[in-house]
């Protein structure tokens, strides 16, 4: 009996210790990881979409600023690679995991986006198929009196800077959203694609913010064809890839569109098309699609197909 009593006390103490340790630990630390892509260009991972940090003669341009609360850790990591001031943010599109950190940067920093993204960021509508976390801000920019919103926009193409510091911005059409910007660091031959090329997977098609399942394949193919002298591509959430990977991804999305349209023409329902879909063998290695996203994408292509 005495042995059982002692054991019970020890177990209780252990549970209290575990609970106390868990309470003391608090939320996980926000750690930004850094990869040097080329001499003055870095990719910074975790906390949302991949950020690019481009060190220029007169300061730093940052592409995408991650989730709420990740702006400060991103700023600290940038300080570890350069002491130059941040002069510009370029947001590839409107989603919160790419733009929310804007509000944690100095108010003097210029924010640049495609003109459609600027409109989308005024409203910050939840993307198609995504349920916001209970503690997520409804509109982080309204909560911060408009701080972090774009001051400069472009329509089809814009160049910023010259020579080694030149950045070219392109818009090739609807895809992930209706404002996906392609950011080219011209002298380095590197492009940041944002989430229109998030990785080798089924994309998130955000019809709420103007995305298109019918057009995304053509948009990707146009980017692969029209942007010259690029050999590396920073993806939205995956590893650095190549133009050949981008061409393959364009074909993957076109194949998906064709599959859905053929199913609709044959009289199949959205549920039937989604249930039957498998990643084609020629795209072996692509991530298996989550069921909800697959059905959302089938629905979007279905609705766009008349």
Cite the ranges covered by each PLM segment:
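Extracytoplasmic/secreted envelope proteins and their assembly/folding machinery
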Residues: 38, 51, 71-75, 102, ...
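Conserved beta-strand hairpin/beta-sheet module of binuclear metal-dependent hydrolase folds
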Residues: 32-77, 181-185, 189-195
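Bacterial N-terminal signal peptides that target proteins for export
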Residues: 1-10
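Accessory terminal helices/loops
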Residues: 10-25, 225-230, 239-306
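Divalent metal-coordination and catalytic microenvironments
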Residues: 40, 54, 64, 78, ...
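Active-site HxH/HxHxD metal-binding segment of metal-dependent hydrolases
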Residues: 79-159, 178
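Short, hydrophobic/aromatic-rich segments at coil-to-beta transitions
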Residues: 38-42, 164-169
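Metallo-beta-lactamase
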Residues: 59-61, 67-69, 159, 166-255, ...
């Amino acid at each position: 009996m005495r042995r059982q009593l002692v054991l019970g006390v020890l177990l209780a103490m252990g549970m209290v210790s575990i609970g106390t340790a868990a309470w003391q630990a608090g939320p996980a630390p926000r750690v930004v990881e850094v990869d040097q892509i080329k001499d003055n260009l870095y990719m910074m991972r975790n906390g949302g979409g991949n950020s690019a940090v481009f060190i220029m003669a007169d300061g730093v341009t940052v592409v995408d600023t991650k989730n709420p609360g990740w702006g400060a850790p991103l700023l600290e990591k940038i300080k570890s690679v350069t002491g130059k001031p941040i002069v510009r943010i370029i947001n590839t599109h409107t989603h919160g995991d790419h733009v929310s950190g804007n509000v944690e940067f100095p108010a003097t920093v210029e924010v640049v986006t495609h003109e459609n993204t600027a409109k989308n960021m005024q409203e910050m509508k939840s993307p198609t198929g995504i349920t916001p976390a209970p503690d997520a801000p409804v509109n982080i920019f309204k909560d911060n009196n408009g701080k972090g919103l774009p001051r400069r926009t472009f329509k089809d193409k814009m160049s910023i800077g010259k020579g080694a510091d030149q950045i070219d911005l392109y818009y090739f059409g609807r895809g992930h959203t209706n404002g996906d910007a392609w950011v080219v660091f011209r002298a380095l031959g590197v492009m940041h694609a944002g989430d229109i090329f998030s990785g080798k997977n089924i994309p998130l098609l955000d019809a709420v913010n103007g995305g298109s399942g019918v057009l995304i394949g053509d948009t990707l193919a146009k980017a692969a064809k029209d942007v010259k002298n690029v050999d590396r591509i920073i993806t939205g959430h995956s590893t650095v890839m190549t133009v050949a990977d981008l061409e393959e991804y364009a074909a993957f999305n076109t194949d998906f569109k064709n599959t859905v349209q053929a199913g609709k023409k044959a009289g199949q329902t959205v549920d039937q098309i989604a249930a039957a879909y498998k990643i084609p063998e020629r795209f072996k290695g692509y991530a298996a699609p989550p069921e909800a996203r697959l059905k959302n994408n089938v629905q979007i292509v279905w609705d766009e197909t008349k």
